[in-house]
Amino acid sequence: MSKLKIAVSDSCPDCFTTQRECIYINESRNIDVAAIVLSLNDVTCGKLDEIDATGYGIPVFIATENQERVPAEYLPRISGVFENCESRREFYGRQLETAASHYETQLRPPFFRALVDYVNQGNSAFDCPGHQGGEFFRRHPAGNQFVEYFGEALFRADLCNADVAMGDLLIHEGAPCIAQQHAAKVFNADKTYFVLNGTSSSNKVVLNALLTPGDLVLFDRNNHKSNHHGALLQAGATPVYLETARNPYGFIGGIDAHCFEESYLRELIAEVAPQRAKEARPFRLAVIQLGTYDGTIYNARQVVDKIGHLCDYILFDSAWVGYEQFIPMMADCSPLLLDLNENDPGILVTQSVHKQQAGFSQTSQIHKKDSHIKGQQRYVPHKRMNNAFMMHASTSPFYPLFAALNINAKMHEGVSGRNMWMDCVVNGINARKLILDNCQHIRPFVPELVDGKPWQSYETAQIAVDLRFFQFVPGEHWHSFEGYAENQYFVDPCKLLLTTPGIDARNGEYEAFGVPATILANFLRENGVVPEKCDLNSILFLLTPAEDMAKLQQLVALLVRFEKLLESDAPLAEVLPSIYKQHEERYAGYTLRQLCQEMHDLYARHNVKQLQKEMFRKEHFPRVSMNPQEANYAYLRGEVELVRLPDAEGRIAAEGALPYPPGVLCVVPGEIWGGAVLRYFSALEEGINLLPGFAPELQGVYIEEHDGRKQVWCYVIKPRDAQSTLLKGEKL
């Protein structure tokens, strides 16, 4: 790792010596420098203000000549003053190096700094991992290429916990403990746990630390499957489901406003555990998505005020957010910024750092904010939480993953975190404006009008600080969500959501022609742009501080190009050459509009948008026949049979089934196949056969080919009499 540089104004006198590389200040973005030397003229022209605004804390020196004097108001903001004096050049150089070295050291947060120092010691390893700094890989040409591709430093940093010098990641000692304490401070938590196998594991840690069989868990039906696994299958808790919204475009919405009313919640409890309906605080835990995959953001203050007194704890699954407290207009939705008292619930927040923060894949973190209930019976102490943590953590952690979490916290510390996210918000707004100005059919998912004026007519700076430009106002046609209250939800400004033609925004019905978003997504991938996901007539692009306008303009250019191909009805072989080549016999002679029409007609024929909506409405929830944990145990014991989808109607699901993404279960183990869920999967099955190349990923069901047709199969619980036979010796 090379030393950071010194940035120097081109108008500075030559008044210091240094062994570091020097670059002109206008050639640097301030991320590769350890100190900056300005002229007095630079300071008076605002350069010092620009440097301070970054929040990086880079030491700044002012070089003077001709007996210039630095105005007193600047002195507290700088590290020193250099005069143009030949005899002091080396002395000033030592001052500069001291400041630069100190900055370089504090720039590296505790765990990363310890890791770098340890690797630089060059210890001879006779412990795990067996590749021992990459040397084993270098014994073979393939392994050597592997090391050369990723770089030696990654392999040297892959350490074993056999050396206590690096502390302990499981019992949180030494540098790992300091790193997590630092993250807790940055994110306003009482305690933070770094998790190295994704938020699926973070959720299970929390759920296994809190829930036991018989506990009531208030359960957002939008919850990721990991919450079902942890709360229902592993812990055996009893769910009380909250219905959620879907709109005609396929976007995942929030929980209905009426679901947060106490009287309604007690009615739901009476349906599953009548003896608990009148308890003062009946729920051990509520599990709520702070932000849905499709960018519907909750107001945490509202959630706590409405249901907090009914819950011991609330888990805000923040896999798809985590940056909200660094964006001023989103701060009210952050559960970690809440002022809480002894009557409030304990707060737990899980964040997928790898999704939209700065982390390697699988990096996640758990934030615990519950000191306000410490001493109460419901309080979960660290030792109990860590017991669950160790159940799900590997004893062979990958140290670079942990270091990435440490760096993520450092990057978000202070002004720099807020600056990065404001840049992201601004770029997202400008990208939406470009699409509105240049596209005719593909539209950003934002209000058409704000106070009677077009959304895009407002200044970007105003939109970036005013939530009105992203709020779901009840009854407005542009979003088509039902059941929302005023100021309940808003669109995440850092999720670029677009809609494609095919839905009449005024009534939510299918139009005669449409463009399913999967066709657009495949076109973009063919041309080197990878969206996060698509569904029905919606497509999602994640925005992070990594974006710049050049990258976003490339996206807009491809959207415009797609629209031109659509208008000219270009041959499918030109638009989607890879899919066409793989399925040339099926799509021979097809045009783009022909494919769009055929897929759109399939959706309309099955009314897929309505099926999606119904699956998450209480009226259409699958009927519960068994506790999810009991159904899972039956599956593990083999008390199941694999049946075709049509034969599953009326049978008890042994596995949870879902399309991925988004990873939200449509049917839960123990529920009965039928209704909207069965019709939805039947529509997917028809699409898989009718339109090869566009098959979704399905989990919990199995696609098998019989007589030239692909069929969906699923496991269901055997009838009781069949189970009895099995227990007497029948072999599966």
Curated annotation (Swiss-Prot):
It holds the Pfam family OKR_DC_1. Induction: Induced at low environmental pH (at protein level). Part of the speFL-speF-potE operon. Expression induced by ornithine (at protein level). Optimum pH is 7.0. GO terms for biological process: cellular response to acidic pH; putrescine biosynthetic process from arginine, via ornithine; spermidine biosynthetic process. The modification N6-(pyridoxal phosphate)lysine is found at residue 355. Pathway: Amine and polyamine biosynthesis; putrescine biosynthesis via L-ornithine pathway; putrescine from L-ornithine: step 1/1. GO terms for cellular component: cytosol. Its EC number is 4.1.1.17. Keywords: Decarboxylase, Lyase, Pyridoxal phosphate, Spermidine biosynthesis. Transmembrane segments: none annotated. NCBIfam families: ODC_inducible (TIGR04301), PRK13578.1 (NF010092). Belongs to the Orn/Lys/Arg decarboxylase class-I family. This is Inducible ornithine decarboxylase.
